[in-house]
C-alpha cells in the first residue's frame, strides 16, 4: 500500500521534470538555420534555454528543451540521427 501511494506522488512529478530534444521553433514557426555548432549552442542555450545545441542537417538542434517549448515535427529517423550525433559529441 505504501508503494502505491509513493508511486501516485512521484509519477506525476517525473512527467513534469522531463525534457525533450528537437528543432526549436520561434514565434513565427521557423527554425534557426546554421553552418557551425557554436552558433547553435548559443542559440539553443540563450534563446530557448535548452541544455545545449548543435547544427544537425543545417538546422539548430536543441538538447534538453523544456516540455512547453514548441519543436518542429520531424521524421523519427531524422530525430534518431540528430540524437545519436549529439550523444557522440558529449
Swiss-Prot record:
Tissue expression profile of the protein: Expressed by the venom gland.
Where is this protein localized, as stated in its record? Secreted
Keywords associated with the record: Disulfide bond, Ion channel impairing toxin, Neurotoxin, Secreted, Signal, Toxin, Voltage-gated sodium channel impairing toxin
- What InterPro entries does this protein's entry cite? LCN-type_CS_alpha_beta_dom, Scorpion_toxin-like, Scorpion_toxin-like_sf, Scorpion_toxinL/defensin
Which Cys residues form disulphide pairs?
Answer: 34-55, 40-60, 44-62, 56-82
GO MF, any single term: toxin activity
Any Gene Ontology CC annotation: extracellular region
**A Pfam family per the record:** Toxin_3
Q: Principal place where this protein is found?
A: secreted
Its biological purpose is as follows:
Excitatory insect beta-toxins induce a spastic paralysis. They bind voltage-independently at site-4 of sodium channels (Nav) and shift the voltage of activation toward more negative potentials thereby affecting sodium channel activation and promoting spontaneous and repetitive firing. In vivo, induces paralysis on insects. When tested on mice, it does not show toxicity but has an analgesic effect.
Q: What is this protein called?
A: Beta-insect excitatory toxin BmK IT-AP
State the organism's lineage. Eukaryota, Metazoa, Ecdysozoa, Arthropoda, Chelicerata
Amino acid at each position: 500500500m505504501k508503494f502505491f501511494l509513493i508511486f501516485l506522488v512521484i509519477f506525476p512529478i517525473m512527467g513534469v521534470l522531463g525534457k525533450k530534444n528537437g528543432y526549436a521553433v520561434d514565434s513565427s514557426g521557423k527554425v534557426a538555420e546554421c553552418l557551425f555548432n557554436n552558433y547553435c549552442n548559443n542559440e539553443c542555450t540563450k534563446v530557448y534555454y535548452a541544455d545545449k545545441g548543435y547544427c544537425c542537417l543545417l538546422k539548430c538542434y536543441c538538447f534538453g528543451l523544456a516540455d512547453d517549448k514548441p519543436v518542429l515535427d520531424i521524421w523519427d529517423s531524422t530525430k534518431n540521427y540528430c540524437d545519436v550525433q549529439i550523444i557522440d559529441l558529449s
